[in-house]
Amino acid sequence: MEGNPGKRIDFVDLTKGVCIILVVMAHIGGAFDKLDKDSMLSCFRMPLYFFISGVFFKSYEGLLGFIVRKINKLIIPFLFFYLSAFLLKYIIWKIAPGVFQLPVSWKELLVVFHGHDLIKFNPPIWFLLTLFNCNILFYLIHFLREKHLPLMFALTLLIGCTGFYLGKLQIELPLYIDISMTALPFYVAGFWIRRYNFFLFPSHRFDKLIPVFVLLALVVMYFTATTLGMRTNNYSGNIFQVYVAAFAGIFMIMLLCKKVKRLKVISYLGRYSIITLSIHGPILHFLGPLVARYIHNDWAQAIALLLITLSICILLTPVFLKVIPQMVAQKDLLKVKQNHTNNPSYEDKQ
C-alpha cells in the first residue's frame, strides 16, 4: 500500500522536534543523563533522526542531480556551520586567550578527516556528513525496489551489518562512512514506511491501539536497550539488541507524536531542525560555563540550559531563514535542473 509522498504530515515535524530536543538534552548531559535509565533514550535517539530523514527521500532526476541536491541540503550547511563555529572559537581565543584551556590551532579544521574524533568546536555537526553518505548509499540501491525488492532489503541488511561489525572491530572508515552503513536500515525503514504503509496516514482504525503499541515498545526496549555511540560507531550490545531496541523506540515516539499531531513550538523546531542541530553545540560551549557560574543545582542548571538554548535557536531560526536560507537547506545554492514530474511539496529539508 503506497501513501501519497506529496502531502505534508504534521506529526513528522513534531517527531523531528522531539528528536532534536532529545539531542540537545544529551549534549547538555548532567541531570538529563539520569533520565536515560538503562539507555532507554540513547538506544533510539540518533536512529530516530536517520529514520525520519528516510521519510523524506526522493530520487529526483538522476544521480548527479540527486548529489547536487544533497550537497545543497547537507554539505553546504555542514561546511558553513563547521567553518563558522571554528572561526568563532578562533576569534574569541585571539581576543581573550584565557577562555580556552588550550590554544586554538588551524589544524583543528582537519579533525573531520581524523577518524571519528570529536569536533570540539561544533560536536553535533558530524550528523550532516553522515546523513549525506546515507542518502548516497540508499540512492545506489533503491532502484532495486521495482523488480528486485528482496535484493534491496538484503543489501540494506548486509550494509547495516557490515557497518555494525566494523564498529565492533574498531575499524573506522573516513568521513563517517561506516556509521552511515550502520544507520542505513533505519533510513530505509523511514523510506518504506512513508511509501508503502498506512502507518503515516492521518487516521486509521489501528490508531486506537496506539497506547498498547507504545506499551509493547517500552517492554521491548526494557529488555533490549543498550548504549549507542553512533558518532564513534561504538555499541555495547549485540546487533539484535541495537536494532530491535532502536526500532522499538522509533515507533514508540512516532506513535505518540501521531496521537498528539502538533505542538506549535516543538513542531517549529522540528521543521527547521537543521538549524538547531547546527548551532546548539557552539551555544552550549559558551553558555554552559556561564549558567554553571550562577546556578548550582544540577536539575535547575540542566533545565535552564535547555530552555535558554532552545529559545536562542528559535529566535535565530527566522534570521537564518531570511538572511542566509541557502546555508540552512531552505534554498539551493547550487542550481539543478527541475524535474516537473516530481512533486516538490514535501521536499527533504532535513
Where in the sequence are the language-model features?
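Alpha-helical transmembrane segments and their immediate juxtamembrane cytosolic regions
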Residues: 1-350
